[in-house]
Curated annotation (Swiss-Prot):
This is Mating factor alpha. Pfam families: MF_alpha (PF04648), MF_alpha_N (PF05436). One of its GO terms (biological process) is pheromone-dependent signal transduction involved in conjugation with cellular fusion. Residues 1-19 form the signal peptide.
Length: 144
């Protein structure tokens, strides 16, 4: 081995052994904010697909909360050209006299008055219905 490579190896070993540990926690990192100054708090600990961005324009400024999953999908679709769909232009519904608003079923029952016996329910429940529970939606999941 050459002298410069040995010298470099010894210098590297000495510098890494003599380096002082870095203090990652300091008291300057926590801000002392009085309780009266706090307007609100939003916990985003479990939401990994929420980003908070500062926003300002000529009329408004504030914080913008975005769903990063939807934003990344939209960014991928930016290169897709937007073509118009084939659709009829909007117009008022026009019905001729006697024309029905909708078509009936082919095998519909004949019309009759609803007859309920005492104690008879208006409808029957499903045999294997799920137990009642609160609706749970994951972040970014649509309502329907």
């Amino acid at each position: 081995m050459r002298f410069p490579s040995i010298f470099t190896a010894v210098l590297f070993a000495a510098s890494s052994a003599l380096a002082a540990p870095v203090n990652t926690t300091t008291e300057d990192e926590t801000a002392q904010i009085p309780a009266e100054a706090v307007i609100g708090y939003l916990d985003l600990e479990g939401d990994f697909d929420v980003a908070v961005l500062p926003f300002s324009n000529s009329t408004n400024n504030g914080l913008l909360f975005i769903n990063t999953t939807i934003a990344s999908i939209a960014a991928k679709e930016e290169g897709v050209s937007l073509d118009k769909r084939e659709a009829e232009a909007w117009h008022w519904l026009q019905l001729k006299p006697g024309q029905p608003m909708y078509k009936r079923e082919a095998d519909a029952e004949a019309w009759h008055w609803l007859q309920l016996k005492p104690g008879q329910p208006m409808y029957k429940r499903e045999a294997d219905a799920e137990a009642w529970h609160w609706l749970q939606l994951k972040p970014g999941q649509p309502m329907y």
